[in-house]
Amino acid sequence: CVKSIYSYYVPSSTDWSIQDACKGFFPNVFVDIEGACAEKKYKALSCYRTELRDAPHPRSIESIQILDKACGIHVGLKSAECFMLHRRIV
């Protein structure tokens, strides 16, 4: 049984949606990914060569690293993955 439903930020895709209170991405869950976890993320992303572009494109490794640092800043971490919790059953 699914207990929680989250969405995540997709660089250069999420930005094109209409940003209002009913739609849009407003993160409220942050996961610390500093260090080895972040490196695994970037290594995994590099496997998707057709999806990545050169900086300053939002889907470049460099831009994604900057986004991760910006997400971390919001919650006092060096690097974070941000999610939006839509529903949780407790």
Language-model regions: role of each:
Residues 1-90:
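Metal-dependent de-N-acetylase/amidase catalytic core
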